[in-house]
C-alpha cells in the first residue's frame, strides 16, 4: 500500500520531467521507465526514450500556439515512418551519388533522382531520332563518334554523286544556252558547265597553252599593221593635254631627267639613256637604275605606235623631260625584227613608253602637279 501523501508527489515529478510540461498537456508517467544511477554521486538520469515515445512527443499538439515552432513535413514523415531512414542508408553508392537536393516552394529539401529524369526524357523523344541522344551520352563515346562521322560521310558522298549525275545528264548547246548563262557561274574559281567538253579534250595540253593569252603590249598596236596612217588620230594623240594624276596612276614608273644618249632601233623605235637625280624619282616600283656619279642612269625604249609621218614623241639630247610609262618584262613580246635589232640591249626592269604615254618638258608647274599626284590616292 502506498501512502496517500506520496501519490501527489509522484504525479508532480512525472509532469515536471515530461517535455510537454508548462505547455498545458499532462503526460502520465511510463511505468516501464526506470531511474538509472549516474556516475556522479547523488544524481540520477532518466533513461533514453524509446522510438515510440519520441514519435509521440513530436506528434503532440500544443494547447496554445504562442512561441511554438511549426513542424516541417519532412520532420513529421521521419517521425511517423522511422523505417525510411534505414531505406535511405541502404541505397547503393552509385545511386546516392546521382541524387541531388532541390528546394520546392520552401517546403523542405527533397531528393530528386537525376537518373530517373534522364530515362523519362529519353522516353519522350520520338522514335525517328533515337540516334541523337546517343551522341551526347557519357558511355560509348568512340562508337558515337564513328556513327557521327559515317553519317556525314554518307551525306557528302550522296550529295556529290547526285551533283555529278545531274551534271552528266545535262547536254548544253552553245547556240541556245550562252544567251541564258548565269553571270555568277562566270566568276573566277567556278566551273563553267558550258566548257566541260573543252576542258576534258584539252586536259593533255599544258596550262600555259590553254589559259595563257599573249601578254604583248604591242600585239595589236597599229604600228605593226600594214597600211595604217591616220592624220587625225596622230594630231589628236600627239597634241592632247594629258592629266598628270591619271597618267601617274596608270603608269609603272614616273621620273624626270635629262636625255644623255639616244639610239635609233629601226624606223619606229629609239633607245634613250636618261640621267635622273634622286629628286626626280617620283615612282619607281621595279625600275632598274644604275648609279653614275651624282645621278642615276635609266634606259627607256620609245616606240611610235601610231606610225605617223612625224614622230609623236620627239626627244632632243640635253633636254629635261617628265616621262611616265611601263616597265619591260619578259612576258612582253616584240616582233621578231625588233628583237633582232635590240640585240639584248633592253633588259627586264628597263622603261618602256609608247605614243600614248605621258611625255612633257619639265617646268616647275608640271613638277608640282606630278608631286601632288604622287601624294594623292589613286582610284
Curated annotation (Swiss-Prot):
Disulfide bridge map? 234-308, 238-312, 249-378
Q: What PROSITE patterns does the annotation carry? A: NTR
Q: Where is the composition biased (Basic and acidic residues)?
A: 180-194
Give the residue range of the signal peptide.
1-17
Q: Where is the chain membrane-spanning? A: none
List the PANTHER family hit by this protein, alphabetically: UPF0450 PROTEIN C17ORF58
Q: Protein name, please?
A: UPF0450 protein C17orf58 homolog
Which species is this record about? Xenopus laevis
